[in-house]
Amino acid sequence: MLPGLDVRTAGRTLVAPGAVHLQAYLPIESQKQLVARCLELGAADAGFYTPIVRGGHPMSVRMLCLGRHWNALTYRYEDTRADIDLRPVPGLPEELATLAGRLAEDAGFAMNPDICIVNWYSAGSRMGTHQDKDESPESIAAGAPVVSVSLGDTARFLFGGLRRKDPVQPIFLESGDGFVFGGPARLRYHGVSRILTNTGPQGLGVQGRLNLTFRQF
């Protein structure tokens, strides 16, 4: 983990079979360390960028890929940023992989994370409901979880079912929260409908919301 990074769990909510919300998982000092690390990685070569999706439209979030690059045009993971600038993808730092593994374990899963996508949300950013299904068939079939860490402003997160038309449950993810879904919940639809501005902790070192999502390819 990052030096001195501590974890705790103030609350653990089973949202659905295979989906766990870990409230207040990271104390404030650990959040600050993690924010600083993300901004450091994002300022380096092959750092934060704005993805352009099919149809030529920019996404409303800035993105940083570690371990493998997610191509917004092909929906595939790659070793280079083929749809952006052809730069090689930065590796996933060991301390971040360790954090993801700890979160997964605390939610009842085992995983070997090798991908992290950091999404940087501003006040008007959204993320439409979607399934995370671009990982390997073996990983998805095994139910290897998606592990999420929220930093900064609170997000109104939508968690749905296995069909796009299924009802969604709104969940407010606050700074320091973890959210893990795998097993029977691995292919549930999810998204972000709103960012609640100026709700993050004072002195965190970031405006908006950083969301780290870890996966096992």
Predicted feature descriptions by range:
Residues 1-217:
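Non-heme Fe(II) oxygenase metal-center motifs and adjacent flexible, charged/small-residue loops
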